[in-house]
């Protein structure tokens, strides 16, 4: 007879950064996991006497922290990485990306591109991602098979694409997808109206009603450029954020991507409706779209999180790099060295993102009772020495390549920097094959 507590997995490490409670850092402790849940965080010295465990992984040089959550991207667009650079948003979209999508995007493209993106995200510490792209059923299936947590937002536009004929068709297909994944814990289906300038009033009203009925998230590009805002004022008499508020689309389940153009009226709306802002600093910088005033948002207690956007406009999917850029940019925009500190940047990529997704009760921090989504980072490197401030190192020393292990729901998806549920060679081979086809078509001028 034993009084030991049963456990499936124990992972011990030099440090554990739980994110919540704020300011806590465990040293020489271990995460104890059973049935995909964190059941304890205890000193490593006591695990043998307290637990009857199936597996123990000791990582003496590593930091454990919550898995990162990429709040906005277009995963399959990784196959368009570097296709068109050094261009403003609308020229980039209209002259390069939309024509390429019309030529190449189908279900196989989305499957292959999503697998490429997931491989990159997992290897750099992302355990959960929000996606908005065509053929969302392919992305959802790929995420489920890989064991990643995901919010898949089905696209809605006024005009036809290869995935649908118009708003009614997009919504019909999206609702079917939502039904298919209703009981799948790892995959959440949301509404993805592309932008205020590509979706008209009636579809936006319907989305608002349906999302409320289904308790589903809404993710939309919003205030990405100054032109978007000025066009809305010219065409509708109000700024885009006010327009979607008037249509019933703004609320605590709404995730607003970019928000580089913000005035006092916008701040008031965001506060009143408890909407979330997704900051994509590297994409905004690359497309010269503007600067999201993150420090101002946070001063008004507006939940702000991080996304990479797609690799076609970034051009990588490293959230650690995004944290670094966000922190530096936040200081520059606010003209305050104490703006967007390392703690804040880490929260934006973890608990804030989980809050925006409505998942902060299960992920986003390492706490007893939450799901075991966490990563390990090796700090036994020259570029991390000496270690005075771990959180500063996480944000400021480019650690994405130092991720050694990744767990989602207690399952190991990366071990010793090797993918466990995705085939690296196959993914790379398919990406190269797409490159050959796309380059040949572009060279022919067809």
Curated annotation (Swiss-Prot):
UniProt: Zn(2+) binding residues: 72, 74, 221, 309
EC number: 3.5.4.28, 3.5.4.31
Pfam families, per the entry: Amidohydro_1 (PF01979)
Molecular function, one GO term: S-adenosylhomocysteine deaminase activity
Ranges annotated as spanning the membrane: none
The entry's keywords: Hydrolase, Metal-binding, Zinc
Top-level division of the source organism's lineage: Bacteria
InterPro entries in the record: Amidohydro-rel, Deaminase_MtaD/DadD, Metal-dep_hydrolase_composite, Metal_Hydrolase, MTA/SAH_deaminase
Record's cofactor remark: Binds 1 zinc ion per subunit.
Cofactor: Zn(2+)
UniProt catalytic activity: S-adenosyl-L-homocysteine + H2O + H(+) = S-inosyl-L-homocysteine + NH4(+); S-methyl-5'-thioadenosine + H2O + H(+) = S-methyl-5'-thioinosine + NH4(+)
Keyword check for Acyltransferase: no
Gene3D superfamilies xref list: Metal-dependent hydrolases (3.20.20.140), Urease, subunit C, domain 1 (2.30.40.10)
Binding of substrate, residues: 101, 194, 224, 309
Keyword Zinc: yes
PANTHER family: AMIDOHYDROLASE-RELATED DOMAIN-CONTAINING PROTEIN, AMINOHYDROLASE SSNA-RELATED
Family in the record: Belongs to the metallo-dependent hydrolases superfamily. MTA/SAH deaminase family.
Functional description taken from the UniProt entry: Catalyzes the deamination of 5-methylthioadenosine and S-adenosyl-L-homocysteine into 5-methylthioinosine and S-inosyl-L-homocysteine, respectively. Is also able to deaminate adenosine.
Name used for this protein in its record: 5-methylthioadenosine/S-adenosylhomocysteine deaminase
Naturally occurring in which organism (per UniProt): Saccharophagus degradans (strain 2-40 / ATCC 43961 / DSM 17024)
Gene name tied to this protein: mtaD
């Amino acid at each position: 007879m034993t009084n030991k507590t049963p456990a499936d997995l124990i992972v011990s490490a030099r440090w554990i950064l739980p994110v919540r409670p704020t300011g806590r850092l465990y040293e020489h402790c271990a995460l104890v996991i059973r049935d995909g849940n964190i059941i304890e965080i205890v000193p490593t010295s006591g695990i043998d006497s307290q637990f009857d465990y199936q597996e123990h992984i000791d990582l003496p040089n590593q930091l454990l922290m919550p898995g990162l959550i990429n709040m906005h991207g277009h995963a399959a667009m990784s196959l368009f990485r570097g296709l068109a650079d050094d261009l403003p948003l609308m020229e980039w979209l209209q002259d390069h990306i939309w024509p390429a999508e019309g030529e190449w995007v189908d279900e196989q493209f989305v499957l292959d591109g999503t697998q490429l993106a997931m491989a990159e995200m997992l290897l750099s510490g992302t355990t959960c991602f929000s996606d908005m792209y065509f053929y969302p059923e392919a992305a959802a299936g790929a995420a489920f098979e890989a064991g990643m947590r995901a919010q898949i937002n089905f696209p809605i536009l006024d005009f036809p694409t290869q995935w649908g004929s118009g708003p009614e068709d997009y919504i019909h297909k999206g609702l079917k997808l939502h039904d298919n994944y209703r009981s799948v814990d790892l995959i959440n289906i949301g509404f993805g109206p592309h932008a205020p300038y590509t979706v008209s009033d009636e579809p936006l009203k319907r989305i608002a009603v349906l999302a409320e009925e289904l308790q589903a998230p809404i993710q939309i590009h919003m205030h990405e450029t100054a032109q978007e805002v000025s066009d809305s004022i010219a065409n509708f008499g109000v700024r885009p954020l006010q327009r979607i508020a008037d249509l019933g689309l703004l609320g605590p389940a709404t995730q607003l991507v970019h928000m580089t153009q913000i005035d006092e009226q916008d701040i008031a709306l965001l506060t009143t409706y408890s909407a979330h802002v997704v900051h994509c600093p590297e994409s905004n910088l690359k497309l010269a779209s503007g600067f999201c005033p993150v420090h101002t948002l946070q001063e008004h207690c507006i939940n702000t999180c991080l996304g990479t956007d797609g690799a076609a406009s970034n051009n990588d999917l490293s959230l650690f790099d995004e944290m670094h850029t966000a922190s530096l940019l936040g200081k520059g925009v606010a003209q305050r060295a104490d703006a967007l500190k390392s703690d804040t940047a880490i929260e934006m990529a973890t608990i804030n993102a989980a809050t925006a997704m409505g998942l902060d009760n299960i992920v986003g921090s390492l706490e007893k009772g939450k799901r075991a989504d966490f990563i390990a980072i090796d700090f036994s490197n020259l570029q991390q020495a000496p270690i005075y401030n771990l959180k500063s190192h996480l944000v400021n020393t480019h650690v994405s390549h130092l991720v050694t292990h990744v767990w989602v729901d207690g399952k190991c998806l990366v071990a010793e920097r090797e993918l466990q549920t995705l085939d690296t060679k196959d993914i790379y081979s398919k990406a190269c094959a797409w490159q050959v086809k796309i380059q040949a078509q572009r060279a022919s001028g067809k």
